[in-house]
């Protein structure tokens, strides 16, 4: 599927430019972040803000987001204070559809999206064709 980047059209039309719109293939990605785990959420958020000059975008005991240099670090609560997996996370509107696109493009589905807390699925674990793990998430309501 090819999508036109409409913001590009609106911006350039306002400037009087007639450049054709950008087109790209692929799923809609709402946010890209790198996710880590923390045993102590407050300590982790304070660390990334103090050491790297981060700005808190969202914070609770389940998931917090800290912006650093136009990137986002997702800090997931429930870590055990030891080295754990971290990973590239694409926030998409629909993890089931996103996982299907990854599989159709030669990737793998490592963990089926499951409903949780009376909400639609919010997580799919996938891998690219080279085996690199990718998380697809949907923004949760809480």
What are these regions (language model features)?
Residues 53-59, 108-113:
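Short secondary-structure junctions
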Residues 7-45, 72, 86-88, 138-142:
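N-terminal beta-strand motif that seeds the catalytic metal site of vicinal oxygen chelate
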Residues 48:
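Terminal peptide-recognition signature
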Residues 8, 12, 16, 55-86, ...:
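Conserved short beta-strand elements that form part of the metal-binding/catalytic scaffold
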């Amino acid at each position: 599927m090819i999508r036109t980047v409409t913001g590009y059209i609106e911006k350039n039309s306002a400037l009087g430019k007639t450049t054709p719109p950008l087109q790209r293939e692929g799923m809609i990605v709402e946010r890209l972040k790198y996710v880590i785990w923390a045993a102590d959420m407050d300590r982790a958020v304070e660390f990334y803000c103090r050491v790297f000059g981060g700005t808190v975008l969202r914070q609770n005991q389940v998931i917090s987001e800290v912006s650093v240099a136009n990137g986002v670090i997702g800090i997931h609560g429930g870590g055990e204070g030891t080295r754990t997996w971290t990973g590239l996370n694409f926030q998409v509107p629909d993890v089931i559809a996103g996982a299907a696109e990854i599989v159709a493009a030669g990737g793998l589905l490592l963990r089926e999206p499951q409903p949780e807390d009376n909400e639609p699925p919010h997580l799919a674990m996938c891998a690219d064709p080279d085996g690199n793990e990718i998380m697809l998430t949907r923004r949760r309501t809480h």
